């Protein structure tokens, strides 16, 4: 009789859109399930790699999809290998870019890496942190300068010899730029090879990535094979659509929710996400069964917003945020129409935030407005304003929005 196939656990399948080496989902599924079973029998945790280049300072919910999957591997007893790409960040991943990236300094990269680790939960308990930094054997944090900075010229040439120009141009970003006559710097061809070499250096069994990383993850498999290692599995997750429901979540597109935004700001943004995205947000950002969501579209949005906010701040904070958001809109009265109006016709634009508050009478003076903003008491449509000098260029950007000072003072902005 044929052996009963090993089933891949639900936590691993959740949100997954691609798994290779095999082009056949069932084959790759079965192979990884077998590898998991072997690891359990041999008491040898899998080494699960995720690389991040610290090219910015903030992590948003779009980034968190991969960290959540990495945490799921940790909770299943495996070893997460988080690679801080302090060397590769100097080149910059060309994936998704139509031009050569601006190179960062070592100081900028290290400052960004420090903020990344803090946001992921370094120094926090495992219960509160996105990654488990405290349980022995569950996390290795490595910087790829450990192995890449010491490569000599013959070794670099050897790496280059494992790939062809044709392979590189088959990568969509490079191919598009080449076809359009947009320059490709030679050092950019090195990036996929260096990311692949990271897998060799840490002897990865699995590499996590977004769907846009398939070329780079596959390069890791090729290099592991070249160095006589057992090739890693590539497990790919989708790119999260931003709050606009159109483009990927990206700070440059102003459609993000920060990983550690305060509960009210997070909830207020999420409850406005287009209904078409609600199920994917639930699958990728929570442990909630999407089948448990209400049928009514508005209630679905609220349920998703609570679930995602709770995943970061706890259910009590999420429910409090929902109540606060409702009061913000209603002014603690019967309906939103009853919120007192503040008129922008007498405000001189461009207007800084502290001036706006005093000009419409929400604060008695500019100095009071500055104090309120710095104290975290001012919100615009639920999003905290933290910079007194934040500038609004035109009144049309504020029309219909609710400006809040403290817990009880609201004004709907109008002409």
UniProtKB/Swiss-Prot annotation:
Subcellular location: Cytoplasm
Source lineage: Bacteria, Bacillati, Cyanobacteriota, Cyanophyceae, Synechococcales
Motif 'KMSKS' region per UniProt: ranges: 248-252
GO molecular function, one term: tyrosine-tRNA ligase activity
Description of how the protein assembles with itself and partners: Homodimer.
Main location: cytoplasm
Catalytic reactions on record: tRNA(Tyr) + L-tyrosine + ATP = L-tyrosyl-tRNA(Tyr) + AMP + diphosphate + H(+)
Residues that bind ATP: 251
Function of the protein: Catalyzes the attachment of tyrosine to tRNA(Tyr) in a two-step reaction: tyrosine is first activated by ATP to form Tyr-AMP and then transferred to the acceptor end of tRNA(Tyr).
Keyword Ligase among UniProt keywords: yes
Domain (S4 RNA-binding) ranges: 351-415
Protein known as: Tyrosine--tRNA ligase
